[in-house]
């Protein structure tokens, strides 16, 4: 598997910066709207995750380009086909086929930064199958390692949370470490596009196809 280093800046942010924004977006979604939880109905709209966010809109207005997040959806039905409606514009696509994020607040037994770092690295190290195909072509992976220091994510919804009710979260803030394999696709022409994500490890499996309709309106 060949892994590339991405150095391009998109809308004023590096790929590493955008992966941090991805996790912020994911953790700030309610469980019913979050594509990587099993809480709530498995409806197609949830895989869009209430995008575009205010930050994504601001980037588009300021820079003339922005980034759309596509989650791996590890708890979707095997071989699911999900249609996403995306507004016309210079949208890059950030895809996380095999990614990991961990926190002391979510896993109290990880009582040091080294233990949290080992947790995410071990999770990614278990990946034994990985491929992503866009419009019939395999696309490259970029490995991003954001484990040097904790990354704070605020406004995590914890009230009435079925997954986080037992966690020791103060004011909905968590300190995270993140790493994993990402795909980053340049803006595409309006119309229909097909994205297939497959990844497998000893702890999870992702098999999902997204039909991307770049014509709007957004989900």
Give the predicted meaning of each segment.
Residues 1-58, 210-218:
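N-terminal segment immediately downstream of the Sec signal-peptide cleavage site
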Residues 1-14, 18, 27, 54-61, ...:
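Feature for soluble, non-membrane regions of globular proteins
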Residues 35, 40, 54-65, 98, ...:
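Extended interaction regions within the primary functional domain
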Residues 65-163:
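Extracellular-facing segments of soluble proteins and assemblies that are Gly/Ser/Thr-biased and enriched
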Residues 104-105, 194-196:
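A surface/extracellular/periplasmic glyco- and lipid-processing/surface-interacting theme
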Residues 126-192, 198-217:
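Extended, well-structured beta-strand/loop surface patches
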């Amino acid at each position: 598997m060949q892994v590339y280093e991405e150095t391009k800046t998109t809308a004023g942010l590096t790929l590493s910066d955008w992966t941090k924004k991805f996790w912020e977006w994911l953790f700030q979604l309610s469980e019913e709207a979050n594509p990587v939880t099993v809480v709530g109905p498995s409806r197609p709209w949830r895989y869009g995750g209430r995008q575009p966010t205010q930050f994504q809109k601001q980037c588009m207005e300021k820079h003339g380009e922005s980034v759309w997040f596509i989650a791996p959806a590890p708890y979707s039905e095997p071989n699911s086909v999900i249609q996403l409606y995306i507004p016309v514009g210079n949208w890059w696509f950030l895809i996380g086929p095999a990614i990991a994020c961990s926190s002391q607040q979510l896993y109290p037994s990880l009582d040091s930064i080294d233990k949290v770092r080992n947790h995410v690295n071990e999770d990614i190290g278990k990946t034994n199958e990985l491929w992503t195909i866009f419009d019939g072509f395999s696309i490259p992976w970029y490995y991003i390692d954001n484990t040097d220091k904790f990354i704070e994510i605020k406004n995590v919804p914890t009230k009435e949370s079925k997954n986080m009710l037992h966690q020791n979260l103060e004011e909905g803030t968590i300190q995270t470490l993140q790493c994993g394999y990402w795909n980053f696709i340049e803006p595409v022409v309006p119309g229909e596009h097909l994205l297939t994500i497959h990844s497998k490890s000893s702890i999870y499996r992702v098999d999902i196809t997204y039909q991307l309709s770049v014509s709007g309106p957004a989900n």
